[in-house]
Amino acid sequence: MSLLEQVSVSKKANIYFDGKVASRSVFLADGSKQTLGVVLPGEYEFSTSQGEVMEVTSGRFEVLLPESTLWQEFSEGTQFELAANVSFKIRNTAIAEYCCSYL
């Protein structure tokens, strides 16, 4: 879905990696939370505290999923799922965006 309706958005961004990754929290009418993020070119490692579904909304990422040794490509319109309490890496060569839904 390219449009989120009936939401509240946090004014303050979450800034990571010296400003190279930024996201905003979005609260949906049903009480659930998502984050919308922009990632500048680079390689980054993230950790999860709860399960997540990461949808690529523009551009593409290469992702090193937990317990994997092979990078996988995810482009606009695709997604991948992460369990709680895992680490994963992403890398990209151009600006890319994502929407993270929490499980």
UniProtKB/Swiss-Prot annotation:
Describe the reaction catalysed, as an equation: a purine D-ribonucleoside + phosphate = a purine nucleobase + alpha-D-ribose 1-phosphate; adenosine + phosphate = alpha-D-ribose 1-phosphate + adenine; cytidine + phosphate = cytosine + alpha-D-ribose 1-phosphate; guanosine + phosphate = alpha-D-ribose 1-phosphate + guanine
Q: Which GO terms describe its molecular function?
A: guanosine phosphorylase activity; purine-nucleoside phosphorylase activity; thymidine phosphorylase activity; uridine phosphorylase activity
Q: Which HAMAP family match?
A: Nucleos_phosphorylase_PpnP (MF_01537)
Protein family per UniProt: Belongs to the nucleoside phosphorylase PpnP family.
Q: Which UniProt keywords apply?
A: Glycosyltransferase, Transferase
Underlying gene: ppnP
The record's section on InterPro entries has: Ppnp, RmlC-like_jellyroll, RmlC_Cupin_sf
Can you cite an annotated GO cellular component? Answer: cytosol
Pfam families reported in the protein's UniProt record? Ppnp
Q: What is its EC number?
A: 2.4.2.1, 2.4.2.2
- Functional description taken from the UniProt entry: Catalyzes the phosphorolysis of diverse nucleosides, yielding D-ribose 1-phosphate and the respective free bases. Can use uridine, adenosine, guanosine, cytidine, thymidine, inosine and xanthosine as substrates. Also catalyzes the reverse reactions.
Q: Which domain of life is it from?
A: Bacteria
From the Swiss-Prot or TrEMBL record, give the protein name: Pyrimidine/purine nucleoside phosphorylase
